[in-house]
A protein has these predicted regions:
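Short, surface-exposed "cap/lid" segments of acyl-processing enzymes
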Residues: 2-41
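Short beta-to-alpha linker loops that shape the active-site pocket of alpha/beta-hydrolase fold enzymes
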Residues: 11, 40-45, 109, 202-203
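Short, surface-exposed alpha-helical segments at coil->helix boundaries
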Residues: 17, 21, 55-58, 182-186
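The alpha/beta-hydrolase serine catalytic core
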Residues: 52, 99-198, 203-226
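Short beta-strand immediately N-terminal to the catalytic nucleophile in serine-hydrolase-like folds
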Residues: 79-81, 106
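Gly/Ala-rich beta-loop-alpha elbow adjacent to hydrolase catalytic centers
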Residues: 81-85, 89
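Active-site signature of alpha/beta-hydrolase-fold catalytic machinery across serine-
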Residues: 91-95
Length: 227
């Protein structure tokens, strides 16, 4: 394999998810020289850590980039980031540089701080203020501290510029995303001159199989356009 895609997922999920599996199957079936690498975020899936911090996500992402380039000897590296994965990918570009040939983001969580603080109860805020943890998550419960929220607040990707990467980027955003407002993503894309594909009637996870198939096709065509 000469071309490798690093695929990342959203908060509270796991690398063993059907969306990534379907993407990998279709990509590899069509282009034999492609491969897909996935990994678990800190305190997600099979990872051994208990606490979750965005800066640790950055470290995991960077370790994976170096492993793919140096250990797997990939000639071309691509990024496919979903939700939290999209946020971390955007941070990586401005904080570490761009090792990717092309970058596709599906419903990137550009407003992740706003999302995460929106449902904090007064009781939970008291816990955080006292240095204690609160719990969030789906398939696995994740422990969050005030440091988690502080790191998100300090690294707002909406305040960064992505002009240098825009020619090689694509964003797919659902018009009915219940967490990430479509208009906010559209404004982000316009401000940074990034190509945006509005996906009509798509919710945050792209739960409609037909809509997910369309999104996967668009991303594969972006990574490997037909000659």
């Amino acid at each position: 394999m000469t071309d490798i895609v690093i695929a990342t997922y959203g908060f509270g999920g796991t690398k063993d998810n059907s969306a990534t599996e379907k993407f990998a199957e279709r990509l590899i079936a069509k282009y034999k020289h492609f491969g897909v690498v996935v990994f678990d975020w800190p305190a997600h899936g099979a990872d051994s850590l208990n606490r979750f911090l965005p800066d640790e996500c950055m470290r995991y992402f960077d370790l994976t980039v170096h492993y793919v380039l140096e250990g797997m000897h990939a000639e071309n590296l691509y990024a496919y980031g979903t939700s939290l994965g999209g946020y971390i990918t955007l941070r990586y570009l401005t904080e570490y540089g761009n090792p990717f040939r092309k970058i596709a983001l599906r419903c990137p969580a550009i407003n992740i701080y706003d999302i995460m603080v929106a449902d904090i109860t007064p009781e939970e805020q008291t816990k955080l203020d006292r240095g204690r943890e609160i719990v969030r998550g789906y398939t696995r419960k994740v422990r969050l501290t005030s440091e988690f929220f502080n790191q998100l607040r300090a690294s707002d990707v909406r305040k960064k510029e992505y002009f240098d990467f825009a020619d090689d980027m694509l964003i797919l955003q659902g018009t009915k995303d219940e967490f990430i407002p479509f208009d906010e993503v559209r404004q982000f894309a316009e401000d940074n001159v990034i190509d945006l594909i509005p996906v009509e009637n798509a919710d945050h996870p792209f739960s409609d199989p037909g809509i997910m198939d369309l999104a996967i096709s668009k991303i594969i065509d972006f990574f490997h356009p037909e000659q």
